[in-house]
Regions:
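Short, flexible segments with low predicted structural confidence
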Residues: 2-4, 18-19, 35-37, 52
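Glycine-rich beta-strand-turn "strand-cap" elements at beta-sheet edges
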Residues: 2-5, 42-50, 78-93
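Short, well-ordered beta-strand segments in beta-rich or mixed alpha/beta enzyme
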Residues: 4-11, 41-68
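N-terminal first-folded block
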Residues: 4-26, 30
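Short, structured helix-loop boundary elements
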Residues: 17, 21, 51, 70-73, ...
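An amphipathic, aromatic/His-enriched active-site/gating alpha helix that lines ligand/cofactor pockets
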Residues: 26-38, 57-91
Length: 93
């Protein structure tokens, strides 16, 4: 099994930063409880407060698939509708 890393970049509409963070909290807690998750953190750029990244580490590709199908992941996608300035940019390593 090979560890997988994902970086998901989000650009939030100005004034929506705190709402985005609060909507992300259930996602963060739920993901950290997943069996295949190694780490899951949200970072806000201090010099550009509308820019965020999720830095995610999983034990393998299957763990990413389980995460993508999870209820908390699906709920987050719906919860942030109208908060983003552009689509999420997701990179896998």
């Amino acid at each position: 099994m090979e560890k997988k890393t994902i970086v998901a970049r989000a650009e939030v509409l100005p004034g929506k930063e705190q709402e985005f963070i609060s909507k992300a909290e259930p996602l963060i807690q739920g993901t950290r409880a997943e069996e295949g998750n190694i780490s899951y953190n949200l970072y806000q750029n201090p010099s550009n407060p509308t820019a965020f990244i999720f830095y995610e580490e999983y034990k393998d590709q299957n763990a990413i698939s389980v995460h993508a199908e999870s209820a908390h992941f699906q709920a987050f996608g719906k919860a942030i509708e109208g908060l983003l300035a552009s689509e999420l940019v997701i990179e896998s390593f």
